[in-house]
Amino acid sequence: MKFNLALALSLTVATAEAATELCKQWDSIIEGNFIVYNNLWGQGNADDGGHQCTTVKSISGDTVVWSTEWAWSGGPGQVKSYANAALQFTPTTLSSVSSIDSTWKWRDSYTGSDIVANVAYDMFLSSSATGSEEYEIMVWLAALGGAGPISSTGSPIATPTINGVQWDLYLGPNGAMQVYSFVAPSSTENFAGDMKGFIDYLTSEQGLSKDLYLLDVQAGTEPFSGSDAVLTVSEYSVNLA
């Protein structure tokens, strides 16, 4: 996932007193503990065009209800966007994080064809609180239509059990970042667990430093292609402690 935070905040910013629709590339809404982004960062990859709108239905404290509807064509294998709900917090070292408890209830429906997308958490790490992103940790709750994670080999490097689920772990570069992707064995539309478990595994088993700073905790969907797709999030909450 990519986006320009400064640009996003300088454009459309609203509050969630009523349902709000975000349709421009960098539209966002700030309320409670969240920023919700439409975030069409890869729309230029859609050679044959497309569109996407994200609707924020309610935000209250650490819980948000939202949906996103999209249609993208062209640019096979290229991510077009990452509509997401991002937790607002001050960057902190991994060693200072006790838990990242989260609940995510969602469903993905479509009447079109060729739907290729994921539904995933996204966390970014850096060696300093204000530094550029050096590591990305993705947790895929769904891989729709054959969507696959970034990988140097095309095969998992490990199959750890975290939060009672055995995940396929992939590793590969995205520009200057190293991307760790935990992929669930099947779509998980009702998730509840501690996201810190994924970080703990990487620090204990994959050599990730506990001195790294956690910059972002986000949850959303990356579409590659398809039409008439709707991701509906009936409940999303996350609490960093």
UniProtKB/Swiss-Prot annotation:
Its EC number is 3.2.1.151. One of its GO terms (molecular function) is cellulase activity. InterPro entries: ConA-like_dom_sf, GH11/12, GH12. Residues 1-18 form the signal peptide. It catalyses: xyloglucan + H2O = xyloglucan oligosaccharides. One of its GO terms (cellular component) is extracellular region. Pfam families: Glyco_hydro_12 (PF01670). Keywords: Carbohydrate metabolism, Cell wall biogenesis/degradation, Glycosidase, Hydrolase, Polysaccharide degradation, Secreted, Signal. It is found in: Secreted. One of its GO terms (biological process) is polysaccharide catabolic process. SUPFAM superfamilies: Concanavalin A-like lectins/glucanases (SSF49899). Catalyzes endohydrolysis of 1,4-beta-D-glucosidic linkages in xyloglucan with retention of the beta-configuration of the glycosyl residues. Specific for xyloglucan and does not hydrolyze other cell wall components. Belongs to the glycosyl hydrolase 12 (cellulase H) family. This is Probable xyloglucan-specific endo-beta-1,4-glucanase A. It comes from Aspergillus clavatus (strain ATCC 1007 / CBS 513.65 / DSM 816 / NCTC 3887 / NRRL 1 / QM 1276 / 107).
